[in-house]
């Protein structure tokens, strides 16, 4: 009998018995959040940095309920939709910045450092990116860039990779289990905004190169492991991806328009087709992503991600 699979994990009869035992103890675990946390803990469903995958587990339990496998307690409140990002003078249009890349001096590209910079990042993206601000789930790092004169130039972020990309997955050559066990080692550049008053040739490719050089160590400092591959999607109706090509990213073709998180090939919400770009962060990235998984890797504590990342290789 095929084990049911939810959110990248197969649930064995023993796993389902654990879920049933937690659900039966309503006095100890009265809410959906408490149930999800306890199931996640008992099944050792962990993120690569050792934290519980509470949200992933909760989503899996909701999917099981929709499929008639279990009944959860009613939600205590309805989730609120995020409101518009409040704007301030900090994100107002600034004087035009022109000239050559050299005129900018050394560029500082670094992760946002505090709540104020995070709020500024959100404002800039909401106000000046053509897609606006979108909430990203899972692991992510946001960056801001300044020139040597303290002028703000750009914003970008990196987040969890797309669930499936046919061209990428063919190139890597991994199977479904390997993809589920190693997908965290692929990171998506999900936002790249050069502020519209900044008109400097070769700035975009320069920033991409700087991001590639520092992201592995920044990501490892935040999440205890370093990615081995970057990906990004560029709207093919708006852009050709010239800056990515100039920065050494490889174009794998176009997406089908399904959306980056369409796990079931439903095509219910068509999206614009995009160029698929990748940038290896390790020369052996394909071997690392195809590395054998320990038996029932989803049930056991995951392997030490440092052993799978280029920061640990000599």
What is each residue range found by the language model?
Residues 35:
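Extended, charge-enriched "interface" segments that sit outside catalytic cores
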Residues 2-4, 20, 74, 81-114:
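Conserved N-terminal entry element of GNAT/NAT acetyltransferase domains
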Residues 13-19, 26, 30, 41-60, ...:
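Acyl-donor binding region in acyl/amide transferases
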Residues 1-16:
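Basic, amphipathic alpha-helix used for nucleic-acid engagement in HTH/winged-helix/SANT-Myb modules
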């Amino acid at each position: 009998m095929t084990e049911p699979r939810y959110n990248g994990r197969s649930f064995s009869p023993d796993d389902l018995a654990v879920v049933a035992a937690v659900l039966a103890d309503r006095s100890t675990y009265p809410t959906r959040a408490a149930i999800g946390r306890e199931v996640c803990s008992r099944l050792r469903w962990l993120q690569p940095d050792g934290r519980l995958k509470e949200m992933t587990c909760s989503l899996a339990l909701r999917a099981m309920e929709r499929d008639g496998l279990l009944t959860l307690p009613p939600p205590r409140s309805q989730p609120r939709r995020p409101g518009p990002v409040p704007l301030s003078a900090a994100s107002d249009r600034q004087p035009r910045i022109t000239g050559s890349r050299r005129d900018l001096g050394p560029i500082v590209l670094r992760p946002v450092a505090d709540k104020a910079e995070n709020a500024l990042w959100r404002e800039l993206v909401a106000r000046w990116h053509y897609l606006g601000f979108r909430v990203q789930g899972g692991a992510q790092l946001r960056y801001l860039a300044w020139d040597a004169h303290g002028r703000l130039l750009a914003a970008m972020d990196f987040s969890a990779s797309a669930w499936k990309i046919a061209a990428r997955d063919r190139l890597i050559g991994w199977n479904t289990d390997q993809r589920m066990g190693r997908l965290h080692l692929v990171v998506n550049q999900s936002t790249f905004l050069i502020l519209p008053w900044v008109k400097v040739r070769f700035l975009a490719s320069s920033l991409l190169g700087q991001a590639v050089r520092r992201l592995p160590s920044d990501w490892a400092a935040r999440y205890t492991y370093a990615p081995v591959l970057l990906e990004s999607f560029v709207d093919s109706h708006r852009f050709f991806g010239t800056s990515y090509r100039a920065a050494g990213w490889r174009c794998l073709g176009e997406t089908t328009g399904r959306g980056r998180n369409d796990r079931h090939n439903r095509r219910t919400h068509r999206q614009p087709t995009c160029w698929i770009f990748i940038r290896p962060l390790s020369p052996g990235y394909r071997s690392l992503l195809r590395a054998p998984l320990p038996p029932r890797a989803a049930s056991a504590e995951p392997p030490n991600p440092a052993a799978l990342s280029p920061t640990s290789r000599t």
